[in-house]
Amino acid sequence: MDGSAKPRLPRGVKLRRDEVRQRWTLLAPERIFEVDATAAAVLELCDGERELTAIVAELAARYNAPKDVIEKDVVAMLGDLEAKRVLET
């Protein structure tokens, strides 16, 4: 995935906060994925408008972390979700 990619959740896939259980879930047709707060923060930025470089920059600033470390983790996570067809680039 290159820096100009604009990741987004495909139609029918939703990120939701389950307030009763205090957890984030990624709801896809016939599948549910539990995601942690960090993954949810990444997915909230995947709106199809922001490029990957902008998402990484936002997260690096938010968490005061090196961009290269954030980028490696984000690319790995998004690649995994793309392989599961719950993310498009």
Where are these predicted regions, by residue range?
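Acidic, low-complexity/disordered tracts enriched in E/D and polar residues
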Residues: M1-A40, E44
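Long, charge-rich, low-complexity alpha-helical segments
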Residues: R31-T89
